[in-house]
């Protein structure tokens, strides 16, 4: 994000604080009901065993010996002690649950395992044994992720006849980033693996957010060469921890760390970010689930009405989900409607008042739902809006004291990142990739990984050559990219109840229900008087049209209405920050959601590589299971690093394919000097190179015009332009350069520019010329050898 708008009204002190929010008692997404997810829409890979269920092999056979007996026999329970088989079964159950938390099915294979052919055929004894081995390895490493788990250690508890499965499972888990990842010293000091080819393949990664950083670190561990291009001057992307400071002379040392973007670890069971926190020794703060609500005039909401309306809201949401199931069963998923429309219909059926406390409470829950999805309810798909719910990670929702920037900067350490490089175009083809930046530099590699937010793809900020497949373009259009904004307020002291992490605020106007509807206290996280106010739904859009100073004043007005009647004075903040994620040119929004007409399949389409394995995609909007989450972004980086490694291994088997160094091409005049030494035609001070990919008379040609004298000792320079072949022929017959220059502007509407201003079309033409000449040179060399 660009530097957020901030204001610093004069005031008094505060103490240090930290991070930002997720939802407590009023859960971030909603209450869960058994019938909420249409099972027909959930993809479950169950590989049928070759034998009947009664003959199905048991996973115990995969282990070599029983676990050791309890350390002490001092305490004994009545009755027969557990048998070895029972103890083993319990251990296997625990291992299966740990593996499930990490994203594995308890009794089946993942799609990646099937694609990697980890076993010769699906089903039967081999699959059951492999699953037990896989779960055992995952569980063993997760028990202490500060250590590097070796293959020999993984073999220790496994029978000799299953050692082959251990080798396969260990290799799969290592390549896909399920084990031995992260920032522990033992992990960082491990030598890189042998690359799939020599020289090692080079990968250009676009974006230094969590997806880009996790992919870069994992690819480096796999022996690849990596360069990360980042448009901002910092890592993290939408995960941004800002240090707020007091500008008051009276309280000069008051600071606080605030997460202005991604802030909450949404479920720590199996969460790779929780693993990073454990490796770095970072404590986790559970978000406490008591959330009092206040009316616009500051009075607390009546608890009976609050409970009744929360129950009503959940009943309505349940009925909407039952309707969805009926629609899917009878008409199929092709028939869709907005979640907002369905909620409105059932809300009327429940005779919810159009005004008063009940209506405001219902609106608060709707605002909460819009926050969870960063979307207007009118845009959300009724059928697929919560398609990721079956995969939600369990456990507490937590903050990292000091902010998520702590592990962002740890991830970025020693990664080759080029900051201030905004990618403008990506050319991908059989010879590799060429990635252009706004600085006039191009980066050449074997493959590229694009991790930019969906909002950037929707905006068309990056031009792809050739164009992305129509299927991917349509998925980019279908999926939504919503908006959530925040106001961060650093106060001189804590005037609210710091024993609670959240409190809510109701509005009288339904159209403004998302405006400052929820406040988060950071006091318990870092000890500083810091509040965050959330702005969701329609209000998040209007928020960005309002000057930051006015936004802060409105937020303070809300706080004063809540606390002044209690005799509590609300001071002016020492510093304030208003986010503007929607107008941030590096994001154009906050996170993805499923619109009407879209589905979870679109996340899968976005994740697909293009260009015969030259261009890959990662980011939260490419993760069907964990979209709109920080861990979803990180896991997508691991996923694509594994896919890149797999592609490189296949390519290495072809004799003509080998890795290249990452080449940074300075796009100055020098590269064009070489090209224009062999121009297709010249006249006066004009030199022309035609597009080698198109003989069409209307196709663009690259024109260079010498400005100044042509004598060796005269001062001169060059300007460039794109002119059609037809116009080139007209220029050639004109009388002198002065007439030609006039015709360029007057008749052809063409401007001459310097080398760095040729734009995407010009850079693409230069690439085609270079590639054509390179092919010609190779063909000549081959002919000479013959």
Regions found by a protein language model. Give the residues of each.
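Long, charge-rich, low-complexity intrinsically disordered regions
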Residues: 2-137, 163-175, 181, 185-189
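Intrinsically disordered, low-complexity segments
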Residues: 4, 36-48, 675-682, 686-692, ...
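FAD-dinucleotide binding site
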Residues: 82-112, 149-152, 169, 176-699, ...
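Amphipathic alpha-helical segments within well-ordered protein domains
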Residues: 138, 152-155
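Short helix-capping/hinge SLiMs at alpha-helix to coil transitions
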Residues: 142-145
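Short helix-coil junctions and helix-kink-helix linkers
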Residues: 155-163
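Short acidic/polar mixed-charge low-complexity motifs
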Residues: 299, 439-441, 710-711, 717, ...
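Short linear proline/tyrosine/threonine-rich motifs used for host-factor recruitment
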Residues: 688, 702-707, 720-722, 731-733
């Amino acid at each position: 994000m660009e530097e957020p708008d901030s204001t610093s009204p004069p005031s008094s002190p505060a103490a240090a604080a930290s991070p930002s929010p997720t939802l407590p008692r009023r859960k971030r997404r909603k209450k869960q009901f058994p019938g909420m997810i249409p099972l027909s829409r959930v993809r479950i890979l169950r590989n049928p065993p070759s034998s009947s269920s009664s003959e199905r092999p048991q996973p115990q056979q995969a282990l070599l010996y029983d676990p050791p007996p309890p350390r002490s026999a001092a305490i004994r329970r009545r009755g027969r002690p557990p048998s070895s088989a029972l103890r083993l079964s319990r251990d296997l159950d625990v291992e299966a649950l740990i593996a499930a938390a990490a994203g594995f099915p308890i009794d089946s294979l993942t799609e990646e395992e099937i694609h990697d052919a980890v076993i010769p055929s699906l089903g039967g004894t081999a699959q059951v044994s492999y699953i037990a081995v896989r779960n055992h390895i995952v569980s063993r490493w997760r028990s202490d992720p500060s250590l590097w788990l070796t293959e020999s250690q993984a073999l220790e508890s496994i029978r000799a006849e299953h050692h082959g499965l251990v080798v396969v499972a260990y290799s799969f888990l290592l390549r896909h980033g399920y084990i031995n990842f992260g920032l522990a010293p033992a992990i960082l000091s491990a030598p890189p693996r042998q690359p799939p080819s020599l020289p090692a393949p080079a990968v250009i990664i676009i974006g230094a957010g969590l997806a880009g950083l996790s992919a870069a670190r994992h690819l480096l561990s796999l022996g690849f060469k990596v360069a990360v291009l980042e448009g901002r001057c910092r890592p993290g992307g939408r995960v941004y921890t800002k240090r707020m400071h007091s500008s008051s002379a009276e309280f000069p040392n008051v600071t606080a760390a605030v997460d202005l973007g991604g802030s909450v670890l949404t479920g720590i069971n199996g969460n790779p970010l929780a693993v990073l926190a454990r490796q770095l020794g970072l404590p986790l703060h559970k978000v406490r689930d008591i959330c009092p609500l206040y009316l616009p005039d500051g009075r607390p909401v009546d608890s009976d009405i609050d409970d009744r309306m929360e129950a009503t809201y959940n009943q309505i949401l349940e009925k909407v989900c039952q309707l969805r199931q009926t629609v899917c069963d009878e008409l199929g998923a092709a028939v869709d409607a907005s979640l907002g429309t369905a909620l409105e219909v059932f809300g009327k059926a429940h005779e919810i008042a159009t005004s008063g406390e009940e209506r405001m409470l219902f609106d608060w829950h709707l605002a909460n739902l819009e926050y969870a999805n960063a979307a207007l309810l009118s845009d959300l798909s009724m059928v697929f809006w919560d398609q990721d719910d079956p995969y939600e990670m369990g456990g507490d929702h937590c903050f990292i004291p000091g902010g998520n920037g702590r592990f962002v900067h740890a991830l970025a350490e020693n990664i080759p990142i080029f900051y201030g490089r905004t990618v403008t175009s990506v050319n991908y083809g059989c010879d590799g990739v060429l990635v252009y930046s706004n600085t006039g530099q191009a980066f050449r590699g074997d493959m590229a990984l694009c991790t930019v937010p969906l909002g950037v793809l929707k905006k068309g900020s990056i031009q792809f050559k050739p164009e992305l497949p129509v299927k991917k373009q349509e998925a980019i259009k279908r999926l939504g990219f919503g908006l959530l904004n925040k106001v961060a307020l650093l106060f001189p002291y804590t005037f609210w109840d710091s024993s609670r992490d959240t409190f809510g605020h109701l509005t009288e106007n339904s159209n403004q229900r998302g405006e400052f509807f929820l406040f988060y206290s950071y006091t318990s996280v870092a000890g500083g008087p810091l509040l965050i106010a959330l702005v969701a739904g329609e209000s998040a859009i209007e928020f960005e049209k309002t000057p930051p100073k006015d936004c802060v004043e409105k937020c303070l007005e809300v706080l004063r209405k809540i606390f002044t009647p209690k005799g509590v004075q609300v001071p002016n903040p020492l510093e304030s920050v208003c986010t503007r994620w929607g107008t941030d040119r590096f994001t154009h929004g906050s996170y993805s959601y499923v619109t009407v007409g879209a589905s979870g399949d679109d996340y899968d389409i976005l994740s697909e590589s293009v260009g015969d394995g030259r261009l890959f995609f990662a980011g939260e909007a490419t993760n069907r299971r964990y979209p709109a989450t920080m861990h979803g972004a990180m896991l997508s980086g691991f996923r694509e690093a594994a896919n890149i490694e797999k592609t490189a291994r296949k390519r290495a088997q072809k004799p003509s394919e080998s890795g290249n160094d990452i080449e940074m091409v300075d796009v100055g005049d020098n590269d064009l000097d070489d090209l224009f030494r062999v121009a297709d035609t010249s006249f006066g001070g004009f030199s022309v190179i035609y597009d080698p990919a198109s003989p069409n008379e209307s196709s663009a040609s690259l024109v260079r015009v010498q400005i100044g004298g042509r004598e060796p000792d005269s001062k001169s320079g060059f300007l460039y332009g794109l002119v059609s072949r037809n116009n080139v022929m007209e220029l050639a017959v004109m009388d002198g350069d002065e007439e030609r220059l006039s015709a360029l502007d007057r008749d052809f509407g063409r401007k001459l520019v310097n080398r760095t201003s040729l734009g995407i079309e010009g850079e693409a033409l230069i690439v085609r010329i270079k590639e054509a000449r390179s092919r010609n040179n190779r063909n000549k060399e081959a002919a000479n050898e013959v």
